[in-house]
Amino acid sequence: MSLDKIMNEAISPWMKGDGPDSDIVLSSRIRLARNFKKYQFSTMQNEEETKQIQELFKKEFINKTVEPFGEFELLKMNELTPLQRRVLVEKHLISPNLAGTEYGACLLSESEHISVMLNEEDHIRIQCLFSGLQLSEALQSANQIDNWIEKEVEYAFDESLGYITSCPTNVGTGLRASVMIHLPGLVLTKRISRIIQVIQKLGLVVRGIYGEGSEALGNIFQVSNQMTLGKSEEDIIADLKSVIQQIIQQEKMARELIVQNSSIELEDKVYRSYGILANSRLIQSAEAANCLSDLRLGIDLGYIKGISRNILTELMVLTQPGILQQYAGGPLGPEERDYRRATLIRERLRIEKN
């Protein structure tokens, strides 16, 4: 695996899969926060300690193979351009917070299912991504990597509290489980606000596509647990999965309601968006996201034939500003990005139809 490959292949292997409930659930993510006993927390570290953690991972973990994820490569933030960092964020491989650090790094698996972020809010954050609703499978893989790392380092752990983390909400298991979910039916029926209120009352968090502070572009929402103290990993996963399954049922009911009461209006909306995507010469990211959401809904409901349902996930990544500029070989102005975005979408749809 090389940096060029990571940058030039915008679609990670995990994005190409069709996991359970993938008509509504786009992806499942598990993140484990860990700190090392011998170092101060990242928020209090000096430059030398952050470099020592990087060197530890360079020595013990790079070019090592862990099946089924392949070899691991270490990407140091201060050796990447701002554009390369942005691409990693847009591919969901690192957090925006890590991208802004000088001495952060990412240990990335060849399959891109696994990324271990170094010197972010915690010393390490192990992230595992799967398509569809596969929280248990993602947790199993994250624990596999966690055990692999723990053979070489000693974690900060308290017998009564659990894993010690920088943020109090992560103390305990250090587990943050999240699901990326496409909810156009609930948005169109104006039920989404009520659903979000119910989710929040259950102690869960609802965010946009790139996490905290981001928008819910293309009717895509991220639902995750908030507290970890006093609950086992299995209980956290079971509780989140139960809520997600209820949201899936609510979304399916909303879609059925729209088809029953407004079928021709919905079909018109889908085909108008399809027409915009297939013919536009300039398109901004927000409009593209909304039209792609409509197209995906049309595919799921059978209005549109011959186009893969994965096109939403794929083009939501491919048309992000960083990846467009990476493909172009350098910075682009807003209008140039809109032109390239429209061109890429037209070409992708043409390939699908042929």
UniProtKB/Swiss-Prot annotation:
PANTHER family cross-referenced by the UniProt entry: ARGININE KINASE 1-RELATED, ARGININE OR CREATINE KINASE
CDD domains for the chain: bacterial_phosphagen_kinase
Pfam families: ATP-gua_Ptrans
SUPFAM superfamilies noted in UniProt: Glutamine synthetase/guanido kinase
GO MF: ATP binding; creatine kinase activity; protein kinase activity
Activity regulation (record text): Appears to be allosterically activated by the binding of pArg-containing polypeptides to the pArg-binding pocket localized in the C-terminal domain of McsB.
Motif extent (RDXXRA motif of the pArg binding pocket involved in allosteric regulation): 337-342
Function statement: Catalyzes the specific phosphorylation of arginine residues in a large number of proteins. Is part of the bacterial stress response system. Protein arginine phosphorylation has a physiologically important role and is involved in the regulation of many critical cellular processes, such as protein homeostasis, motility, competence, and stringent and stress responses, by regulating gene expression and protein activity.
Family: Belongs to the ATP:guanido phosphotransferase family.
Catalytic activity annotation: L-arginyl-[protein] + ATP = N(omega)-phospho-L-arginyl-[protein] + ADP + H(+)
Gene Ontology biological-process annotations: phosphocreatine biosynthetic process
UniProt organism field: Bacillus cereus (strain ZK / E33L)
GO cellular component: extracellular space
Sequence positions that bind ATP: 27-31, 92, 125, 176-180, 207-212
Keyword annotations: Allosteric enzyme, ATP-binding, Kinase, Nucleotide-binding, Transferase
E.C. number: 2.7.14.1
Protein's name according to its UniProt entry: Protein-arginine kinase
InterPro entries: Arg_Kinase (IPR023660), ATP-guanido_PTrfase (IPR000749), ATP-guanido_PTrfase_AS (IPR022415), ATP-guanido_PTrfase_cat (IPR022414), Gln_synth/guanido_kin_cat_dom (IPR014746)
Domain Phosphagen kinase C-terminal: from-to ranges: 24-254
Domain of life: Bacteria
